[in-house]
């Protein structure tokens, strides 16, 4: 129940979520919705915002992202976090380890709302995964969910539902 989750997070005043699942299932969109429910701005960071070719640059950018979110009292979203937070045991370079260590350090001391999204949960560092309060898998809609969404949209947009609703069951990997 997403409403209950947002209410619980709001009451707690902080939380660390990891949303995972196939592409197009609404992970990033959920973060926008959650920020609105929490009445906070959303700060979204992608690997391109954080990765830096200079020694210590990525670590600096990670720390700056957390500081910005703290200053703005925002929900901090790391989108597609697997692109820079991979398992340290498979690291080929020392900087891969230090950027994960920096993220873990920042994550431990952060007292706000943190959300990470990934399509590749199995590639992420285990120490990082343990630090999330909740890991939630978002899947494609079931046939019943797709039909329910279609019916709700029909009601909202005032059109009648006919036999075309049965065609939804033929479409795979629908997302909201």
Residue ranges and their predicted role:
Residues 1-169:
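Walker A/P-loop NTP-binding motif of AAA+ ATPase domains
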Residues 171-176:
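The conserved phosphate-sensing helix
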């Amino acid at each position: 129940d997403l409403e209950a989750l947002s209410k619980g997070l709001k009451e707690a005043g902080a939380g660390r979520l990891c949303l995972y699942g196939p592409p197009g299932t609404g992970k990033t969109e959920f973060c926008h919705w959650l920020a609105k429910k929490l009445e906070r701005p959303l700060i979204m960071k992608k690997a391109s915002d954080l990765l830096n070719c200079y020694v210590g640059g990525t670590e600096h950018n990670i720390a700056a992202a957390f500081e910005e979110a703290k200053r703005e009292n925002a929900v901090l979203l790391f989108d597609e976090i697997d692109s820079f937070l991979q398992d340290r045991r498979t690291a080929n370079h020392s900087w891969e380890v230090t950027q994960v260590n920096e993220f873990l350090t920042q994550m431990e001391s952060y007292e706000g709302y943190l959300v990470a999204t990934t399509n590749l949960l199995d590639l992420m560092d285990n120490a990082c995964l343990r630090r999330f309060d909740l890991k939630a898998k978002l899947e494609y809609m079931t046939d019943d969910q797709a039909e329910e969404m279609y019916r709700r949209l029909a009601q909202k947009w005032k059109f009648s539902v006919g036999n075309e609703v049965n065609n939804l069951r033929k479409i795979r990997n629908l997302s909201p």
